[in-house]
Amino acid sequence: MSEFITVARPYAKAAFDFAVEHQSVERWQDMLAFAAEVTKNEQMAELLSGALAPETLAESFIAVCGEQLDENGQNLIRVMAENGRLKALPDVLEQFIHLRAVSEATAEVDVISAAALSEQQLAKISAAMEKRLSRKVKLNCKIDKSVMAGVIIRAGDMVIDGSVRGRLERLADVLQS
């Protein structure tokens, strides 16, 4: 877990509440995603770690973001820069997405497999996870050859490891004990 998660939570909540009130949740998520990516840029990371005045840092950051930020998004950047919190933007995005998922009664579910899954397989996984979590799910499918076969399903703190790799690891643990 990131060191900025506690710092990010109030900014994410404020941004989310504002976005809901102004019916612009999708736009805000896009703005936060772009701003979070900007913080990952090597040159911007140096600026964020430097000794620039908050006003200068905020204006530089806003200039880099260009038209990707509306006036309200720019105001959030200014407040975060003033408080020395721009490095927390990736965590603000993460918390914003979490608040949106809770609000929309959806859950992000990562499905990791060795090969692409068929629509039928994805539908079965989706139905099973919706039943288990009692909410709608959004599947994020990833391919990882190291899984070998089977799938790994992650939803929040829950992990269901039905992969061959996981079974081999568990077997190795049993044999070593």
Curated annotation (Swiss-Prot):
Task: Indicate whether Metal-binding appears among the record's keywords.
Answer: no
Q: How does it sit in the membrane?
A: Peripheral membrane protein
A single MF term (Gene Ontology): proton-transporting ATP synthase activity, rotational mechanism
**Keyword flag Chloroplast:** no
Q: Which GO terms describe its cellular component?
A: plasma membrane; proton-transporting ATP synthase complex
Localization annotation: Cell inner membrane
* Xref: Gene3D superfamilies: N-terminal domain of the delta subunit of the F1F0-ATP synthase (1.10.520.20)
Just give the chief location class: membrane
Q: Which UniProt keywords apply?
A: ATP synthesis, Cell inner membrane, Cell membrane, CF(1), Hydrogen ion transport, Ion transport, Membrane, Transport
Family, as annotated:
Belongs to the ATPase delta chain family.
Describe its partners and assembly state. Answer: F-type ATPases have 2 components, F(1) - the catalytic core - and F(0) - the membrane proton channel. F(1) has five subunits: alpha(3), beta(3), gamma(1), delta(1), epsilon(1). F(0) has three main subunits: a(1), b(2) and c(10-14). The alpha and beta chains form an alternating ring which encloses part of the gamma chain. F(1) is attached to F(0) by a central stalk formed by the gamma and epsilon chains, while a peripheral stalk is formed by the delta and b chains.
The entry's function note states: F(1)F(0) ATP synthase produces ATP from ADP in the presence of a proton or sodium gradient. F-type ATPases consist of two structural domains, F(1) containing the extramembraneous catalytic core and F(0) containing the membrane proton channel, linked together by a central stalk and a peripheral stalk. During catalysis, ATP synthesis in the catalytic domain of F(1) is coupled via a rotary mechanism of the central stalk subunits to proton translocation. This protein is part of the stalk that links CF(0) to CF(1). It either transmits conformational changes from CF(0) to CF(1) or is implicated in proton conduction.
Name of this protein: ATP synthase subunit delta
Q: Which organism is it from?
A: Escherichia coli O6:H1 (strain CFT073 / ATCC 700928 / UPEC)
Please name the gene that encodes this protein: atpH
